């Protein structure tokens, strides 16, 4: 009888093993990118100051800003990929030709703008009023290693080219956009559009002195307009341009105090930085 029981158990073993292996494989989630906003980087890199914005700056043209001296809040944004797979976008020339909704063309600096990549908001702590930043476009590349990444530290950067379309006299420049695992795409405070206009020079209401949140959302949700592509849908039915394993960790914010008269030297961690005479583009 014991032999029969043992034989029966051995007969069922392959089936049980197969079921166990199947369950094990089925429970492993697919490798996916996961974008966050580096709150520490934001906290350490902002300044409120008076600054001259000439008409030649593309951010002035694209943001509808009146040229001249303005009170600005400049800041740095870093968006690391802490997921298990690279965020691959590829060549914007191909996406633009396919009209898939990922990119639009900015004529000011012969540059593609990735749509719905990040949302910059300045929020009044007292009233909840929201102001938008001057930033209008983004190019995703591996700018710097994210030191807090919990995974392997020896992964390489793979995405280094924004790309540009052809002109009447110049050929197209192939791009290769994306963010490698453990790397971050970073937009430093000096770049075009990395600021809020505080004095109403961009057509928005004046930002009065007081306490505010700088709120950054990477890969923000949006409602697709009629005919607009919706590449990825979250659990709330909202669209996202990029696929991620987790859409719930895409927002970060810091609280700051905006003074009445910041002056040219400014107030904040980046005070006393030289005034800008040119506007680097990303």
Give the label of every model feature segment.
Residues 7-16:
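Bacterial N-terminal signal peptides
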């Amino acid at each position: 009888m014991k032999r029969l029981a043992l034989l029966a158990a051995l007969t069922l073993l392959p089936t049980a093993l197969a079921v166990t292996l199947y369950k094990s494989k089925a429970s492993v989630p697919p490798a996916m990118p996961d974008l966050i906003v580096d709150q520490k980087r934001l906290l350490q890199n902002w300044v409120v100051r008076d600054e001259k914005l000439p008409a030649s700056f593309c951010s002035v043209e694209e943001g509808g800003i009146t040229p001249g001296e303005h009170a600005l809040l400049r800041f740095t944004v870093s968006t690391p990929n802490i997921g298990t797979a690279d965020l691959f976008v590829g060549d914007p020339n191909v996406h633009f030709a396919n009209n898939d909704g990922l990119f639009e063309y900015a004529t000011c600096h012969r540059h593609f703008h990735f749509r719905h990549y990040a949302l910059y908001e300045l929020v009044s702590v007292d009233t909840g009023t929201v102001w938008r930043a001057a930033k209008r476009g983004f190019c995703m590349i591996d700018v710097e290693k994210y030191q807090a990444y919990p995974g392997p530290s020896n992964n390489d950067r793979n995405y280094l080219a924004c790309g540009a379309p052809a002109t009447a006299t110049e050929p197209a420049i192939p791009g290769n956009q994306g963010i490698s695992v453990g790397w971050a795409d970073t937009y430093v405070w000096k770049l075009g559009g990395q600021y809020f206009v505080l004095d109403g020079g961009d057509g928005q209401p004046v930002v009065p002195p007081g306490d505010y949140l700088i709120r950054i959302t990477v890969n923000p949700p949006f409602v697709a307009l009629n005919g607009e592509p919706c590449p990825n849908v979250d659990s709330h039915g909202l669209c996202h341009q990029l696929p991620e394993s987790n859409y719930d960790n895409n927002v970060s914010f810091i609280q700051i105090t905006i003074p009445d008269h910041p002056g040219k030297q400014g107030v904040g961690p980046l005070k006393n930085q030289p005034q800008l005479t040119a506007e680097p583009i990303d």
